[in-house]
Amino acid sequence: MLVVAAMRVWNPEEGWANRVGRKREGKIVEILRRVTMTAHGLSHFPRQLLRMPRAALRKPNPALDLDSWLKTPEDLPATINSQTLFGNDQPLEIEVGSGKGLFIQTESDRRPEHNYFGIEIARKYAAHAAARLAKRERANAKMLAGDATPLFAVTDEGKRIEDGSLDGVHVYFPDPWWKKRHRKRRVLSHDNILNFSRCLRVGGRLHFWTDVLDYFELTVELIAEIAPELGVPLPETQRESTHDLDFHTHFERRSRKMGIPVYRVCYRKRS
């Protein structure tokens, strides 16, 4: 079977091939989704088939001063906590892979008594998220343009994030790294899971959402094996959105609008 999508061709043996045709994002996506699911007996539509053209990311307003909201690894203090980042002792939560920053913008407004630190490896997205915070003058949220893994890691120099110092770790729709040889790059890797757990306080929560069932199942199994202190996985229910930005993240909005199941789980550290 051969499926023609916007600017791309996909077949089950070779995946995406040469670009063809003209860009048509509406009906062609729905046809692709239904035909592929029916032909291959799929229960969900794989996200790797959704590499549709995206609108260009708007550059932040040059009039906005992002210094208070956008940090680089060089800007960070030796120890990362609420006191060193925000100058107070409010509970600190970290989002790994903030993307365009919808979650950190919404959650920092909803819970002003908590601090939020978003980490995004792609600088243009980190800047976009920081601009959202700057525009709204969020005093309890900041963005880092950088890699989260070195910040959570335990090295010969010590720990950047102390044991039991975080109230929450959020990982939403991380890159699934489809090829088996690349899976070690996943955010929820063996070492990262151990470090996320180490950094959480007792009662702190690890949130993980994805639209990739294989990633979800493997991660739940891995956590049960190596981090039993996180307890049993607690499902997080889907709520109905009331407007176009009433979603956890932009990825959740896209997946739900295209009818793709989203798998959600939360862990509460027991000891």
From Swiss-Prot:
The protein's annotated catalytic reaction(s) are: guanosine(46) in tRNA + S-adenosyl-L-methionine = N(7)-methylguanosine(46) in tRNA + S-adenosyl-L-homocysteine
Q: Which gene is transcribed and translated to give this protein?
A: trmB
Active site positions = D175
Q: What is this protein called?
A: tRNA (guanine-N(7)-)-methyltransferase
Q: Which organism is it from?
A: Rhodopirellula baltica (strain DSM 10527 / NCIMB 13988 / SH1)
Q: Which CDD domains match?
A: AdoMet_MTases
Please explain the role this protein plays, according to its UniProt record.
Catalyzes the formation of N(7)-methylguanine at position 46 (m7G46) in tRNA.
| EC number of the protein | 2.1.1.33
Could you state one GO cellular component term attached to this entry? tRNA methyltransferase complex
Q: Which PANTHER family match?
A: 3-DEOXY-D-MANNO-OCTULOSONIC-ACID TRANSFERASE/TRNA GUANINE-N 7 - -METHYLTRANSFERASE, PENTACOTRIPEPTIDE-REPEAT REGION OF PRORP DOMAIN-CONTAINING PROTEIN
Enumerate the Gene Ontology biological process terms: RNA (guanine-N7)-methylation; tRNA methylation
- Pathway where this protein functions: tRNA modification; N(7)-methylguanine-tRNA biosynthesis
Sites where the protein binds substrate: K179, D211, T249, H250, F251, E252
Gene3D superfamilies named among the record's database cross-references: Vaccinia Virus protein VP39 (3.40.50.150)
**InterPro entries for this protein:** SAM-dependent_MTases_sf, tRNA_(Gua-N-7)_MeTrfase_Trmb, tRNA_methyltr_TrmB_bact
One function term, GO molecular function aspect: tRNA (guanine(46)-N7)-methyltransferase activity
The residues that the entry says bind S-adenosyl-L-methionine are E95, E120, D147, D175
Q: Where is the signal peptide?
A: none
User: What does the sequence similarity comment in the record state about its family?
Assistant: Belongs to the class I-like SAM-binding methyltransferase superfamily. TrmB family.
